Amino acid sequence: PLFQQKAAPLGKKLWQTEHYVNSDANISTIMPIAKEIHDVMVTGSANAYVYWWIPHANGLTANDGTLFKRAYVIGQFAKHVRPGYFRVEATATPATNVYVSAYAGNGKVVIVAVNSSTAAVSQTFTLQNATVSQFSTWQTSASANMAAGSEASVSGNSFTFSLPAQSIT
């Protein structure tokens, strides 16, 4: 709130940096990171969420270079929400434990849906002021690391998609 009152009117941008979260390959310990990025972008109206990619056991990679699950969670936002994209209005919490943010840029629409529930959720998305016929999906979950998912076909500006338990799509 202080940012919106004092800095935003002056044209200042808000960037949020990560902080250490004790998490590893366990999806349940990673979900708070996805929720935090969602909150920073939606509630905090941040322009960027910065994760310092430093090779270290507490960072995004193990000492052997293997990516930790948290890297894939951050990638769900970073790979698809590119520089120059802007956040567009979306119902931030369309269901209990489901968090949605949407972005547009370069003629594309990106929706990031976080399902922190321990059960899959069938979620309907309705698009306004956009003409889209289908979405490519990418998922990170207990068993997937930014894996290509099924296509979501849009009919009459809406589509329903199953969000796996504890996943980012």
Predicted features, each with a name:
Residues 1, 17-21, 51-55, 113-117, ...:
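Active-site-proximal beta-strand/loop segments in catalytic clefts of secreted hydrolases
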Residues 1-9:
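Acidic, glycine-rich loop-and-beta core segments that form the ion-binding/anion-interacting portion
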Residues 11-79, 88-96:
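Aromatic/acidic polysaccharide-binding cleft in carbohydrate-active enzymes
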Residues 40, 74, 111, 137, ...:
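Hydrophobic, well-ordered secondary-structure elements that form the walls
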Residues 93-133, 166:
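Carbohydrate-binding surface patches
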Residues 127-146:
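Solvent-exposed beta-hairpin/edge-strand motifs
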